[in-house]
A protein has these predicted regions:
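Active-site helix/loop of acyl-thioester processing domains in fatty-acid/polyketide metabolism
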Residues: 38-64
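Helix-adjacent hinge/juxtasegments
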Residues: 63-91
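Short amphipathic
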Residues: 14-23
Length: 149
C-alpha cells in the first residue's frame, strides 16, 4: 500500500524516484535500519526532488530564499523493517496544493519491491524567508501536482 492505495501502479509510475544505499552505521541494536535514518534520507534526497521539479540546481536556499517550501507538518508511517545492506528507492509526489501550502507524499522502498517500508506525507507552507511571511504556492509546485486517483 503506497499513498493509501492498494496495488496502484499509477502512484508509482507518476512519481519522481531517487535512490540511496544503507550504511553500516544506519543499523540499530535490533539489527534493522534505525527509524531516524528514514527521515534523514528524505531530508537529504529532498533536494533531488526540488531540482527535478524546478529543472535546475541553482536557486536561493535558506534565509536568502524568497519562495521556498517550509516544512509545517509530517505524518509518518513505518510499515516494515529493513536490514542492511540494501539499496533503497525513494519516491516523491506532490498530491495536494492549496493557496499557500502543499503536500508531498514520499515512500521508501527496498529496491525491486512494490510496497514501501516507510511512507510520509509532508505538508509545506510556501514561505518568503527574506520578508518572513507565507506566500502563494509557486507555479512550479502547481504544475507538478499529481493527485491521487
Amino acid at each position: 500500500i503506497w499513498l493509501g492505495l492498494v496495488g496502484s501502479e499509477m502512484c508509482i509510475r507518476d512519481s519522481f524516484f531517487t535512490s540511496a544505499q544503507t550504511r553500516w552505521r544506519d543499523v540499530d541494536t535490533l539489527g534493522h535500519i534505525n527509524h531516524t535514518v528514514y527521515l534523514s534520507l528524505l531530508e537529504t534526497k529532498h533536494k533531488d526532488f526540488i531540482d527535478h521539479i524546478y529543472g535546475e540546481t541553482t536557486y536561493d536556499l535558506g534565509l536568502k530564499s524568497t519562495a521556498a517550501g517550509l516544512l509545517a507538518s509530517m505524518d509518518v508511517t513505518y510499515i516494515k523493517q529493513v536490514h542492511h545492506p540494501v539499496k533503497l528507492d525513494i519516491g516523491c509526489r506532490i498530491t495536494r496544493v492549496g493557496s499557500k501550502s502543499y503536500d508531498v507524499h514520499q515512500g521508501i522502498f527496498v529496491d525491486g519491491e512494490n510496497e514501501p517500508s516507510f511512507q510520509t506525507i509532508h505538508t509545506f507552507v510556501m514561505f518568503n524567508f527574506v520578508e518572513q511571511k507565507s506566500i502563494p504556492v509557486h507555479h512550479v509546485i502547481i504544475d507538478n501536482l499529481k493527485e491521487l486517483e
